[in-house]
Amino acid sequence: MSKRVQIVLNKTINKLGQTGDLVEVAPGYARNYLIPQGMGVIATPGILRQVEQRKEKEMQRLLAEKQAAEARKVALSTIGRFTIRKQVGEGEAIFGTVTTQEVADAIQAATNQEVDRRGITLPEISQTGFYKATVKLHPEVTAEIEIQVAPL
């Protein structure tokens, strides 16, 4: 009997691997736990081909997401400046602050593209004027936008 068998994981298992990983485990662990629980299958040539096809599709999907984020970055940079109107007190000071939700709404109004407010990084905005903000569109793609805070 062989000392190790190759298993393709169906689920992520702590300290063993992620879904779709090819791992070598003891035959008893595979036969008595992983396979009956549906956490893995024995690696046959057909299953290995399926795993490769699945990984290829996932890579293509991730590449398409990144390209879409790059296109959104170009769209944001061509617009250049987003205006947010706030009520102003004395000395150009605004009431309240500009929130990431307001910036996300301004971007959506100008581009018809929804941006997650949690991906927007703003400086402290307490007066009217021009400010730079960073919008994270993808883990590898960030865009710099300019925000104009203007009185109502």
From Swiss-Prot:
Q: Which PROSITE patterns match?
A: RIBOSOMAL_L9
Q: Which InterPro entries match?
A: Ribosomal_bL9, Ribosomal_bL9/RNase_H1_N, Ribosomal_bL9_bac/chp, Ribosomal_bL9_C, Ribosomal_bL9_C_sf, Ribosomal_bL9_N, Ribosomal_bL9_N_sf
The record ties this protein, via Pfam families, to: Ribosomal_L9_C, Ribosomal_L9_N
Q: Name one GO cellular component term.
A: ribosome
UniProt xrefs under Gene3D superfamilies = Ribosomal protein L9, C-terminal domain (3.10.430.100), Ribosomal protein L9, N-terminal domain (3.40.5.10)
Q: Name one GO molecular function term.
A: structural constituent of ribosome
Q: Name one GO biological process term.
A: translation
What's in the keyword line of the UniProt record? Ribonucleoprotein, Ribosomal protein, RNA-binding, rRNA-binding
Role this protein plays: Binds to the 23S rRNA.
HAMAP family, alphabetized: Ribosomal_bL9
Q: Which family does it belong to?
A: Belongs to the bacterial ribosomal protein bL9 family.
What this protein is called in its record is Large ribosomal subunit protein bL9
Whose protein is this, by species?
Answer: Rippkaea orientalis (strain PCC 8801 / RF-1)
